[in-house]
Amino acid sequence: GSLQLLLLLLLLQCDKKGICSCAPLLTAMSSPRRIKEDLSSDEEGQVHPTLSPSEDHKIKISSLPFSVEALMADKRVPKEAPPSRAVDSSAATSTPNRHLHLGIRDSPSPLGSQKGLKPRRSNRKNSEDGTSWSKDGGSYSPPPRHLSPSSCTLRKHKTNRKPRTPFTTSQLLALERKFRQKQYLSIAERAEFSSSLNLTETQVKIWFQNRRAKAKRLQEAEIEKLKMAAKPILPPGFSIPFPINSPIQAASLYGSSYQFHRPVLPIPPMGLYATPVGYSMYHLSEEGDMT
């Protein structure tokens, strides 16, 4: 009887305070068999609180969504729940953002995949180039130069070209004497002169052509020398007020103590550089050897 009274008091307290606060006391006041069952259920990892039929009925009523207690609980919870909802909403907003960031990074879109794959391929190529460079020992071998085909070949001599005829000294002297006399030979003169020297007419003809070209070059060189000598050596602003050709004025340059007065010969201005426009035998013989 005393146990029933205690149970009733506990039920009243549970109605006032709530079922959850009185649940451990009810389990302690239950029979030892129930305690053993609770211990065995705790060991198995499943919690089944053993309550009286009235308490089970109240729990079932409270578990119904449209019961008075459930509605009262819903009214009380929203006042205390906003922070949790705010936390949940912040977590929910953060998770989509994370998913968005992850989606941007790991999106399987074809454009993203292509853009992401292209630099990787280039990196692979670079790495392969680097490995080949390291394998070669860091020595860069330039690509082999392809030799261009010899399209611009030099002009080849004719195979049927006649060999150069070496003239003797007597022949060269005779040719030089004849060239001084007459630079152009007629056909009859050339035939007679070539037979006298035991040469062909073509050999004599070619020698005279070469000798005329050489004489022209020498004459042009002499004219250039004369032009260079005609230019004044001294600058135009500098001039000597007295001529140095007279022996008296030349002696006055050296002073009165100069005893031996050598007569100074008059020197023409072109005499130092000018040479007679003629051909000596040495030049002619040398030119004949060259031809």
Curated annotation (Swiss-Prot):
SMART domains: HOX. The keyword Mitochondrion does not apply. Keywords: Developmental protein, DNA-binding, Homeobox, Nucleus. Its main location: nucleus. One of its GO terms (molecular function) is DNA-binding transcription factor activity, RNA polymerase II-specific. It is found in: Nucleus. SUPFAM superfamilies: Homeodomain-like. Residues 160-219 bind DNA. The keyword Amino-acid biosynthesis does not apply. GO terms for cellular component: nucleus. GO terms for biological process: embryonic morphogenesis; regulation of transcription by RNA polymerase II. Residues 154-164 have a biased composition (Basic residues). Residues 36-58, 75-169 are annotated as: Disordered. It holds the Pfam family Homeodomain. Belongs to the Msh homeobox family. This is Homeobox protein XHOX-7.1'.
